[in-house]
Amino acid sequence: MERIIEKAIYASRWLMFPVYVGLSFGFILLTLKFFQQIVFIIPDILAMSESGLVLVVLSLIDIALVGGLLVMVMFLGYENFISKMDIQDNEKRLGWMGTMDVNSIKNKVASSIVAISSVHLLRLFMEAEKILDDKIMLCVIIHLTFVLSAFGMAYIDKMSKKKHVLH
């Protein structure tokens, strides 16, 4: 009976597969939004101010960072929780695939969130005259919370690896 339960629990990991497929659809939508922004900016590019262009570029960077985060979560989640990806051509296999554990994934996600938050904060600062000080302060506090969380997670991971080596 125990063996059947263990097999059922182990097989249930495949329930995550539709989640990763859904994330790939989210990535497609994000890609469409990226190119939509480029297409809509082209007619206005010559009349646009430098700061306006920087804001558009920051939006594109933001989308690229979120897209990278999605790809990382899809690939690493699939490889760590469902099945190893069988990519025959090692030259096409991404260098980090198959080498990251769950803690490494969490640290990568946390640093990606900090990068995304940094872009949002920079965009906010560029439009600071239009935004209430309270909102800016709240965004800075949220960003600092992300930064401290990322540092905390990295520190805990480092300590747990060091402790594991000592034992």
Curated annotation (Swiss-Prot):
Broad class of where this protein is predominantly found: membrane
UniProt xrefs under InterPro entries: UPF0114 (IPR005134), UPF0114_bac (IPR020761)
Stretches that traverse the bilayer: 15-35, 53-73, 136-156
GO CC, alphabetical: plasma membrane
Subcellular location: Cell membrane
Pfam families: UPF0114
Membrane topology: Multi-pass membrane protein
Keywords: Cell membrane, Membrane, Plasmid, Transmembrane, Transmembrane helix
Family: Belongs to the UPF0114 family.
Protein name: UPF0114 protein in repA1-repA2 intergenic region
